[in-house]
Amino acid sequence: MPVALITGCSSGIGRALADTFKNAGFTVLATARKAEDVAALQGAGFKAVQLDVNDGPALGALSEEINQQYGGLDVLINNAGYGAMGPLLDGGVQALQRQFETNVFAVVGVTRAMFPVLRRSRGLVVNIGSVSGVLVTPFAGAYCASKAAVHALSDALRMELAPFSIRVMEVQPGAIASSFAKNAGAEAEQLLNEQSPWWPLREGIRARAKASQDKPTPASEFAADLLKAVQQDKPPRLVRIGNGSRALPLLANLLPKGLLEKGLMKRFGLGAKL
């Protein structure tokens, strides 16, 4: 029975992936940060692990546990993440650092910790990026930058892990039904205040936080499509799944930069001078 470690399984994409892989016959190690989410996963029959993806010692202990119990790891899905929304200068370096700690640094930290067990099984690393890493939008600069970094790291890891027969897949989801927009909206509201120079544009900021739920693909469909890709004899390097996952990168590549930015500024209320 193949073994899959999936991070960030409390809801949305992560939970759908855990359900789908479990139903396909995988032993699923599903991680979550909060104790109540771990309890819910355990109640659903998962091997649930309470894990902060930036906790190095905990990652090392989990890798050793996987080695002892299963002898290796077939699939690692780096899914844990969130979207920091709002003007870059309102959030500043601190907000950017928090975003990168979860969305970027943890990808390297988790993969590094799991390298020994991935090597034993000649496993597959699946990094969940986003079309936001290809098409950059205002009021999501930190999130877009973090996902662009995940894409670059995936390419580097693919080449560096090839000698060990470990494969790396990059996933660029479009709009997927989840709690992402709700959480992103909460992040934005924490930054919004009347002293911000961008206060008059607050509705545009809120609109960007909700944009990921524009005609979203069900998370279960996303998970089923990703499972098919993972189970291929030669898993693809890049997988795009969900509403907008193909059209938006195409727009980013074909439209002149100035025209694209003008359209995005208009959509999110940045057309007028302040």
Each predicted region: which residue ranges?
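Active-site helix of classical SDR
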Residues: 111, 146-149
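Residue(s) in the substrate-gating loop at a strand-loop-helix junction
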Residues: 130
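The beta1-alpha1 cofactor-binding region of Rossmann-like NAD(H)/NADP(H)-dependent oxidoreductases
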Residues: 51-61, 93
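Active-site loop immediately N-terminal to the catalytic Tyr-X3-Lys motif
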Residues: 88-89, 135-142
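C-terminal beta-strand-loop-alpha-helix "lid" module of Rossmann-like NAD(P)-dependent dehydrogenases
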Residues: 162-213
